[in-house]
């Protein structure tokens, strides 16, 4: 049987998408591979951690995951709000390597650059203890728990944290070609072992019949 299932947090390939709220974590110290985005379930307040960086804004301007969960991306001061304010026309969003988010807006005919928040990265001293909850999300335990040893460096490029790459996503770190080759090798080994067992059974059966 399978003794255990462990998560591999080594960095995957970075793929440029051109979408301004596609964010990848690049660099950082292994085995943490640069940290995790922190997201929250707005219905329950529960926190989760993920390397997936595909986001968009909802009608309220909050940055949320593009999947069906719609978890809110956390900044240094809570959920990030990157929508235009009253009277503004949003022209562009810029996420710096250190996580600072600047918005280029037009108000009353003037283009203005304003800081809108800071993307939060979270890292752990023992990420192998993060609890997998599915769909690329992980939990650090129940409220008040710290089962994976959260570190006090919540900023990109600080400590073991990586930097933020805007307009890009991190792809899976699984090499499908190697995994399929490994699976076929193991399958053939299993089949060979099964044939050995079958042959041994046949020889034993013949020996028993001869004795009779």
Feature locations, PLM:
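Amphipathic alpha-helical polymerization modules
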Residues: 1-77, 81-84, 88-212
